[in-house]
């Protein structure tokens, strides 16, 4: 509650469209990656935790690796997820947990959406769980790369309409990864655009993205 109050005051934090996730029995949350704040910002309006995936190399960084392990973050190679990491992720989903993934694999260097890494497609194929696209706007301005000071600026989060298991069925076999990635990217882009409009104009989303 303290953290939520701080973000609402300092960043004018607002989120939209997250309510369906409160009752979702296991789902993937795919988000654009703007800053180190992103896992906190995405999870803030929810009354349940999100287990985010982070690149394996971060677990070797002193202090950072310890924090990641203590906050239930799971390690993954974005280019080619190992069998063990895939199994752990899918087990969490099948036990009803929310799992967050940054398809870009790393934070944006300039605020724009970066190219998606293909590794998340393998998780989507095997998990058979809905995908919730999420767009963040303003976090890059609040805490860009190499910055250690949180700047007071508006941050908006838009949770989009889920991509259902039925919709994902057509991508269940290998060879369809490019089409799957394109679909996910288009949904995240729509959420990012809605979040940016909300951030700059003050107009909240009127329809699900």
Predicted segments, located by residue:
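Membrane-interface helix-loop junction between the first two transmembrane segments
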Residues: 14-24
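Residues at the C-termini of beta-strands that transition into short coil/loop
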Residues: 19, 56, 77, 135, ...
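Non-catalytic C-terminal accessory region of glycerolipid acyltransferases
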Residues: 84-209
